[in-house]
Amino acid sequence: MAGRAKPRHRRLWLPLLVFAGTIGLLLYGVVALLSEDPLWFLGRTALPEPLRIVIRVDGEETLLTSFSPGYDVLFEATEKALSSFESLAPRSAGLSEETLAEYEQSGVILEMYFDAPVDFHLPFDDGRPTALLIPIQGRHAGQGYVFRGKGGRWWAGQLVMSNPQPLLDALTMLGYLQD
């Protein structure tokens, strides 16, 4: 009996599989290099414990540190709210000097300051911010915006939370918002 011939189509799978794997690794590598984060695909925010949380309600500022009542509640609620985002690209709006001055006098905003950078694990370079500003009431409020900053400067290109409700619920429970 003559030797069995292998069907030719089976030999095509291996080069196609190697080619597809190479393309996949190349795409992963490009995104990892551009985002400066090899775990960009996780899509979960690594939120370090804040040094301080500042809540500003109509110009009145409340400073919370790790031993303050309500600190843990706000931190956990912020972790939940920042667990997913509506889009994977930052929006183009930023915080003008006028908006920041308005936040000093009216509305409700939440600011968090960290000693370690926040890592959003996104497929672009998130800048590794050490401060977050979340408008709750007033300009830019009600849209789930999260502004990032570092070194006393706020950056253009806010992220949009998918569900800010845990944060709103915590602020209401602590008396910073009215139902």
Residue ranges and their predicted role:
Residues A2-D179:
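Function-determining sites in protein domains
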